[in-house]
């Protein structure tokens, strides 16, 4: 009798274990289907010109222009971390040319950055559209300031190859422009939550500074700043009052 009860208890335990496994499997299957459905859902992105760009899925590889502007590259590296070199299909050399100290630190952590194909720059007409098409990225991020020349010289070729263009803007030096650029890049790469965290971090700190400065009731001194990328041998390299930090 005791052996029979023990055997029945054993069967009950096995039965419960099987049921638990089936429930877990069904739940896992349901969750997988949910994630798959989300990944297959078209992604609508509003870029900095107000255009709506639709991606079938998050971009896996992209081309970057004006990397030396700092903003887009820093946003991408904050979004992707050590995977940054894997997602950049090609870029210009302005980051390493104009911000050599930053480039040195980034390549020390991610040596693969130095192996990313150089595709030239739209701004100085070295942009190699044929090379970009051959690299087959999903997206190309273009600064708003390059829009006219890009649309004249290269965009038709990108459109024909099915490469989506997303305009961003880190040069207006406006909080809203930075926020929208971070959001657009994050959405394009399927990193919306992380992009929201980055945007909040940035917004909190900029707002904190602006709030403090707005409360200073003293004469504001005149300040002259230069762009240091040409070294101490050159002077007069600065921005006008209607561009970047010259605002």
Language-model regions, residue ranges each:
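Short, aromatic- and cysteine-enriched interfacial helices/patches
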Residues: 1-2, 27
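Bacterial N-terminal signal peptides that target proteins for export
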Residues: 2-13
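Core hydrophobic alpha-helical transmembrane segments of single-pass membrane proteins
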Residues: 13-20
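C-terminal motif of bacterial Sec signal peptides marking the signal peptidase cleavage site
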Residues: 21-25
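N-terminal ligand-binding lobe of clamshell/alpha-beta domains
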Residues: 26-247
């Amino acid at each position: 009798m005791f052996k029979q009860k023990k055997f029945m208890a054993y069967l009950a335990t096995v039965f419960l274990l099987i049921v638990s496994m089936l429930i877990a499997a069904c739940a896992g299957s349901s969750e997988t289907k949910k994630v798959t459905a989300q990944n297959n859902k078209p992604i609508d992105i509003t870029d900095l010109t107000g255009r709506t760009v639709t991606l079938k899925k998050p971009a896996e590889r992209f081309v970057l222009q004006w990397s030396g502007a700092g903003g887009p590259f820093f946003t991408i590296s904050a979004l992707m971390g050590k995977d940054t070199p894997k997602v950049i299909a090609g870029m210009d050399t302005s980051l390493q040319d104009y911000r050599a100290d930053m480039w040195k630190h980034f390549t020390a952590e991610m040596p693969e950055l130095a192996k990313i194909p150089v595709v030239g720059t739209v701004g100085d007409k070295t942009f190699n559209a044929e090379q970009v098409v051959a690299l087959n990225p999903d997206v190309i991020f273009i600064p708003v300031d390059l829009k006219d020349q890009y649309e004249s010289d290269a965009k038709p070729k990108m459109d024909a190859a099915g490469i989506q263009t997303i305009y961003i803007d880190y040069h207006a030096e406006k909080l809203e422009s930075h926020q929208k650029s971070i959001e657009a890049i994050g959405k394009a790469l399927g990193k919306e939550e992380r992009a929201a965290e980055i945007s909040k971090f940035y917004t909190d700190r900029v707002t904190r500074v602006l709030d403090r400065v707005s409360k200073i009731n003293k004469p504001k001194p005149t300040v002259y700043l230069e762009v240091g990328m040409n070294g101490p041998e050159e002077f007069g390299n600065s921005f006008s009052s209607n561009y970047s930090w010259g605002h």
